[in-house]
Amino acid sequence: MAGPLRAPLLLLAILAVALAVSPAAGASPGKPPRLVGGPMDASVEEEGVRRALDFAVSEYNKASNDMYHSRALQVVRARKQIVAGVNYFLDVELGRTTCTKTQPNLDNCPFHEQPHLKRKAFCSFQIYTVPWQGTMTLSKSTCQDA
């Protein structure tokens, strides 16, 4: 009698294992499954995200011909991807400050309020970092006036 039950039990066991290892196994209802090694949402409060943001804004200011510094008004979206290091993908709204590029401290610079000097940009940055080597690179940067 054990023979006839063996095949269905074997099929049931194979099905259970296949479901357990499938990418959809850990998915929440209504959300697509997260891929291992794929980009995932990150908090702006994470130290790595903050460092990547500071680096990207610094590089933006270096490349800009504007006499004023810009700084982040709002981080619209932050994602990270673990590779042979970490890729950060940041969508950021930047605002022009009253501080000129000759002023070293950007943290306390207020944003311009005068209409003819006020300027905003929306930027998408990709930053690659290898924290244990202390390296950070701006891989991609696209900005448009907001």
UniProtKB/Swiss-Prot annotation:
Residues forming the motif Secondary area of contact are 81-85
- Is the Transport keyword given for this protein? no
Any one GO molecular-function label of the UniProt entry: protease binding
Q: Which GO terms describe its cellular component?
A: cytoplasm; extracellular space; Golgi apparatus; plasma membrane; vesicle
Q: Where is this site: Reactive site?
A: 37
Signal sequence bounds: 1-26
Where in or outside the cell? Secreted
Q: Which UniProt keywords apply?
A: Amyloid, Disulfide bond, Phosphoprotein, Protease inhibitor, Secreted, Signal, Thiol protease inhibitor
Which SUPFAM superfamilies has this protein been placed in?
Answer: Cystatin/monellin
Instruction: Give me the disulphide-bonded residues.
Output: 99-109, 123-143
Q: Which GO terms describe its biological process?
A: defense response; negative regulation of blood vessel remodeling; negative regulation of collagen catabolic process; negative regulation of elastin catabolic process; negative regulation of extracellular matrix disassembly; negative regulation of proteolysis; supramolecular fiber organization
The keyword Cell inner membrane belongs to this UniProt entry's keyword annotation: no
Q: Which residues carry this modification: Phosphoserine?
A: 43
What functional role does this protein have? As an inhibitor of cysteine proteinases, this protein is thought to serve an important physiological role as a local regulator of this enzyme activity.
Give the UniProt family note: Belongs to the cystatin family.
Name of the protein in question: Cystatin-C
